[in-house]
């Protein structure tokens, strides 16, 4: 079982992809106090784990049988959210617009916990791992991947402390461009999947 757990954790870590979470932490560092961002990281990863746990247990029923939602539709919606955040950062707004509208807990839920942590790829992995290896392997593997993601986000947060305001401002805009690209790719992938399904169904 150990081999299955480790391979499941690796797959889930790849699907979660900590790199874009690290980029977002860099954005948050400009607009929020470091203690608030630390709190956000913990809450976001906890919420992300709960969501993935839910989908690992009953993902197929929730998505397809109850709400009739395809994963490609989630990709498009999640990509739009990320694209909007990246655009604000690129224009120099950072997370200010979101900060005015939502408290730190709400921001931890959206967009950090979902779609960044519990995104379409991670949700698909949770459902697949449960089907292939059972619920225990899926849950433990997901927990390990979430713990690694949270640790990397914390490390990135402290590394950003030594960067000057000017360098941080330039970095924020570059990061914003990458986040826009991630969001655009999610939308393209999702839209492509929707079109392909429509063609197959025709």
Swiss-Prot record:
Gene Ontology CC annotation, any one: plasma membrane
Keyword Protein biosynthesis: no
Localization per Swiss-Prot or TrEMBL: Cell membrane
InterPro entries reported for this sequence: Multi_antbiot-R_MarC
Transmembrane regions listed in the UniProt entry: 5-25, 47-67, 76-96, 104-124, 135-155, 174-194
Main location: membrane
Topology within the bilayer: Multi-pass membrane protein
Domain of life: Archaea
Tagged with keyword rRNA processing: no
A Pfam family recorded for this sequence: MarC
Keywords noted in UniProt: Cell membrane, Membrane, Transmembrane, Transmembrane helix
Family, similarity comment: Belongs to the UPF0056 (MarC) family.
UniProt protein name: UPF0056 membrane protein PH0214
The organism of origin for this protein: Pyrococcus horikoshii (strain ATCC 700860 / DSM 12428 / JCM 9974 / NBRC 100139 / OT-3)
